[in-house]
């Protein structure tokens, strides 16, 4: 569970505000925002769909495939 920082008097400090990755609307990061970092379930599902359709990806090393001249065929 994420806890917001508290001051010496045990009162919450300024809430953390993040931008929704989908629509860029400001969202308070806390228990009252169940879809954080997204502002709504809709924005959360839009993001999930983009990952599922491979519109988003995590950069990494390129795949070596047959088109790159690599093959499982050893030529025996």
Swiss-Prot record:
UniProt-annotated stretches for the region Disordered: 54-76
Binding site for Zn(2+): 20, 23, 39, 43
Pfam family, any one: YacG
Cofactor(s) recorded in Swiss-Prot or TrEMBL: Zn(2+)
Cysteine-cysteine disulfides: none
Molecular function per GO: DNA topoisomerase type II (double strand cut, ATP-hydrolyzing) inhibitor activity; zinc ion binding
Biological-process GO terms, alphabetical: regulation of DNA-templated transcription
Key words, A-Z: Metal-binding, Zinc
Cofactor note: Binds 1 zinc ion.
Ranges of compositional bias, category Acidic residues: 65-76
Superkingdom as given in the UniProt entry: Bacteria
Family: Belongs to the DNA gyrase inhibitor YacG family.
Subunit structure: Interacts with GyrB.
Role description: Inhibits all the catalytic activities of DNA gyrase by preventing its interaction with DNA. Acts by binding directly to the C-terminal domain of GyrB, which probably disrupts DNA binding by the gyrase.
Listed name of the protein: DNA gyrase inhibitor YacG
Organism listed in the record: Photobacterium profundum (strain SS9)
């Amino acid at each position: 569970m994420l806890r917001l920082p508290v001051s010496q008097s045990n009162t919450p400090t300024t809430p953390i505000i993040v931008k929704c990755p989908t629509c860029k609307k400001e969202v308070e990061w806390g228990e009252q925002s169940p879809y954080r970092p997204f502002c709504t379930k809709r924005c959360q599902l839009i993001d999930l769909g983009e990952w599922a359709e491979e519109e988003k990806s995590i950069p990494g090393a390129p795949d070596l495939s047959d088109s790159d001249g690599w093959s499982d065929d050893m030529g025996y």
